[in-house]
């Protein structure tokens, strides 16, 4: 989780070294643990659900550094909140900026989604819109997955 890298038709894990290739139909080679991206995705969802259940509310589930957080107005104007680190817990999403820390209670986030390949967007309980961006490619899907798991509880 969060350690995959791709190059052309190859997919590999930076952590354990597992690798495979994708054929012209979008399937993995037959000797791989998963046959399709959908199978791998289902496994990942199960992993996240078990991981979520196994952690307490003070455990950082995930974090990413060197992100930029902006607010987006109803006129689509972007205002920089700051740069820093984001952390996902079971009950909250935290931005640890260079100048300030902002905590968002997950139950007060009314909507969260992914924009593009590396931008997480969400709306808080006051109706303020935020976007979390990174210059490098980060796995923003993990944050959305935990948010959705929290909504199900």
For each predicted feature, which ranges?
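Acidic, Ser/Thr- and proline-rich intrinsically disordered linker/docking segments
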Residues: 104-153
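Short beta-strand or tight-loop elements
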Residues: 84, 89-91, 105
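Anionic N-terminal interaction surfaces
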Residues: 26-85, 152
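Short acidic/polar mixed-charge low-complexity motifs
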Residues: 18, 84, 98-100, 126-129
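Structural motif
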Residues: 7, 87-89, 114-116
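Short, surface-exposed charged micro-motifs
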Residues: 3, 83-85, 111
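Short hydrophobic/aromatic-rich beta-strand segments that constitute the beta-sheet cores
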Residues: 93-96, 121-122
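Cys/His-rich short segments
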Residues: 2-32
